[in-house]
From Swiss-Prot:
The lineage of its organism: Eukaryota, Choanoflagellata, Craspedida, Salpingoecidae, Monosiga. Belongs to the HAD-like hydrolase superfamily. MasA/MtnC family. Its cofactor is Mg(2+). GO terms for cellular component: cytoplasm; nucleus. Residues 273-301 are annotated as: Disordered. GO terms for biological process: L-methionine salvage from methylthioadenosine. Monomer. It comes from Monosiga brevicollis (Choanoflagellate). This is Enolase-phosphatase E1. It comes from the Eukaryota. Mg(2+) binds at D22, E24, D222. Bifunctional enzyme that catalyzes the enolization of 2,3-diketo-5-methylthiopentyl-1-phosphate (DK-MTP-1-P) into the intermediate 2-hydroxy-3-keto-5-methylthiopentenyl-1-phosphate (HK-MTPenyl-1-P), which is then dephosphorylated to form the acireductone 1,2-dihydroxy-3-keto-5-methylthiopentene (DHK-MTPene).
Length: 301
């Protein structure tokens, strides 16, 4: 399908009862992650670890990070931290481990785009929770997102998120966004515990979990590899082109409809029959992603 390269052109898609949104580069600026979240973590991680270094939860988080990032090895943090310490002793031990931790942090930041199945800093997500709930950080949302969410849900459509970030991180971003709490618009969340975003089977599994055919879902992402995977699973797809996103070749621009914003999205009613199928499948499968709004998140911060 050929597409206009006119940056001002608005593409209108046929209505759909379900929409599946990527986050980074789609609903949210890529720069938000790299220019807001990562610098915040750099500034806060040492103080946070100094306060919580002797807790089993933080040691487990750092161990997960070490295993996820290539070249970091798998030696336990407990081996470096020694016995549990408190107060000044914990701070002293942290200072001794500072080069190790900062090296780990830098590797996490550098490899984030290359490790889509990891939740690197988000595993140490207590920092994010503090950032969002304190109001020091608010999730960036493009200005056309909220009107689109309102319009689509008013038409009866259901909206879902599928991101490399953990479900808990997704809920923090949309729950503490610049536009307020957007979670009421969302019917469910999926992360890479469902499967890799470049694997067609992941999208088939998502459609089955929602309880609709893949053809009933429009998937939106800035990554053409993800759009190809969703299309291979028979989902309708559109490439989202936002400022700062990776450039597309002329050939890539012909593969899928291109959206520069969400003004061309139209919803269709998610019927009672479909909703009933969804509830039945939830009950049968115990799907955690769809139940995320009512149950503890996959990665509880």
């Amino acid at each position: 399908m050929a597409n206009s390269t006119d940056e001002t052109a608005t593409t209108t898609l046929a209505p759909a009862p379900c929409f599946l949104f990527d986050i980074e580069g789609t609903t949210t600026s890529i720069s938000f992650v790299h220019e807001v979240l990562f610098p915040y973590a750099r500034n806060q991680v040492e103080a946070f670890l100094a306060a919580h270094w002797d807790t089993d939860a933080v040691k487990a988080d750092v161990d997960k990070l070490r295993e996820q990032v290539s070249g970091c090895g798998k030696r336990s943090v407990a081996d470096e931290a020694g016995p549990k310490e408190h107060g000044a002793e914990a701070a002293s031990r942290l200072c001794a481990s500072r080069p190790i931790l900062l090296n780990l942090l830098e590797k996490i930041i550098l490899t984030w785009p290359l490790v889509p199945t990891a939740h690197p800093l988000l595993e140490l997500g207590h920092i994010w929770k503090d950032a969002y709930t304190s109001g020091n950080v608010k999730g960036h949302i493009y200005e056309d997102v909220v009107p689109a969410f309102q319009r689509l849900t008013e038409a009866g459509a259901q909206l879902y998120i599928y991101s490399s970030g953990s479900i808990a991180a997704q809920k923090l971003l949309f729950g503490h966004s610049e536009a307020g709490d957007l979670q009421p618009y969302l019917s469910g969340y999926f992360d890479t515990t469902t499967g890799p975003k470049r694997d067609a089977a992941s999208y088939s599994d998502i459609a089955a979990a929602i309880g609709v055919t893949p053809q009933s879902i429009i998937f939106l992402s800035d990554r053409i590899e993800e759009c190809r995977a969703a299309s291979a699973a028979a989902m309708r797809t559109a490439l989202v082109v936002r400022p700062g996103n990776a450039p597309l070749s002329e050939a890539e621009r012909t593969e899928f409809p291109i959206l520069h914003d969400f003004t061309g999205l139209r919803g269709a009613k998610f019927t009672q029959a479909q909703a009933g199928d969804t509830e039945a499948k939830r009950s049968a499968s115990g799907d955690g992603a769809l139940a995320a709004k009512k149950a503890p998140p996959t990665h509880d911060f």
